[in-house]
Swiss-Prot record:
InterPro entries: Hedgehog_sig/DD-Pept_Zn-bd_sf, Peptidase_M15A_C, Peptidoglycan-bd-like, PGBD-like_sf, PGBDSf. Zn(2+) binds at H196, H237, H239. It catalyses: Cleavage of the bond: (Ac)2-L-lysyl-D-alanyl-|-D-alanine. Residues 1-42 form the signal peptide. The lineage of its organism: Bacteria, Bacillati, Actinomycetota, Actinomycetes, Kitasatosporales. This is Zinc D-Ala-D-Ala carboxypeptidase. The modification Blocked amino end (Asp) is found at D43. The active site is at H234 (proton donor). Belongs to the peptidase M15 family. This enzyme catalyzes carboxypeptidation and transpeptidation reactions involved in bacterial cell wall metabolism. It effectively catalyzes the transfer of the N-alpha, N-epsilon-diacetyl-L-lysyl-D-alanyl electrophilic group of the standard tripeptide substrate N-alpha,N-epsilon-diacetyl-L-lysyl-D-alanyl-D-alanine to water. It also performs a weak beta-lactamase activity, hydrolyzing penicillin into penicilloate at a very low rate. It comes from Streptomyces albus G. Its cofactor is Zn(2+).
Length: 255
């Protein structure tokens, strides 16, 4: 696990009469921090103020949806659309339950503080990195979508993996590959419509969990494509991806 960034208490800033601008991470927006007692920390990636609940909308909701994307319910995928509807409320409740918080579906200080504990200054979850999700090139270019979109999709994938990791006892999950440019995909014999070229996909090593346990768990954490043992070319890894449609096939795992 990478070290977490040092958090600055807003109450200390207010008490000292100091004014600091929020720190902006590369390619990640930062919300204006409120100096109210409702917010416990100024985060290096993104800081929420107040609370979010059903009916809320905007960038703050979209940022929340990215972090709870791994809690949509079995077989579902949460839309990252900035609209706090019933599906987002349910995802927030599952996130809260997973971390022992009051599961009211309202994102407030306790929920945000837990997210701050789970994310690094580049907005990735603490147990995964952009480098793990891109072993093809350094700039996310050359895929089926823009580099920015591929990178953003990979961020959502990482938060899904973080949720899955927590559900499986917080044991490390081995990521052997993620984003591929069209060239990288061709070089490894990938399918012409592979979701790797969109930044949606990750190939997982067996780790301590085993391929089948990973494939089975992925069904609960927002992955619409799961391929594993028994599916051609997938006896040596478990492939998980988001994106449109749903296709699960790991016959040796009962999927």
């Amino acid at each position: 696990m990478r070290p977490r960034p040092i958090r600055l208490l807003l109450t200390a800033l207010v008490g000292a009469g100091l004014a600091f601008a929020p720190v902006s991470a590369v390619a990640a927006p930062t919300a204006t921090a409120s100096a109210s007692a409702d917010v416990g920390a100024l985060d290096g990636c993104y800081t929420w103020s107040g609370t979010l609940s059903e009916g809320s909308s905007g960038e703050a909701v979209r940022q929340l949806q990215i972090r709870v994307a791994g809690y949509p319910g079995t077989g579902a995928q949460l839309a990252i659309d900035g609209q706090f509807g019933p599906a987002t409320k349910a995802a927030v409740q599952r996130f809260q339950s997973a971390y022992g918080l009051a599961a009211d579906g309202i994102a407030g200080p306790a929920t945000f503080n837990k997210i701050y504990q789970l994310q690094d200054d580049d907005c990735t979850p603490v147990n995964f990195t952009y480098a793990e999700l891109n072993r093809c090139n350094s700039d996310w270019s050359g895929g089926k979508v823009s580099a920015a979109t591929a990178r953003a999709n990979a961020l959502v994938t990482m938060w899904k993996l973080q949720a899955m990791r927590h559900a499986m006892g917080d044991k490390p999950i081995t990521v052997n590959g993620g984003f591929r440019s069209v060239t990288c995909n061709s070089n490894v014999g990938g399918a012409s419509n592979s979701r790797h070229m969109y930044g949606h996909a990750a190939d997982l090593g067996a780790g301590s969990q085993g391929f089948c346990a990973l494939a089975q768990a992925a069904r609960n954490h927002g992955f619409t494509e799961i391929l594993g043992p028994g599916y051609p070319g997938h006896n040596d890894h478990t492939h998980v991806a988001g994106g449109d449609g749903r296709f699960w096939s790991a016959p040796s795992c009962g999927i």
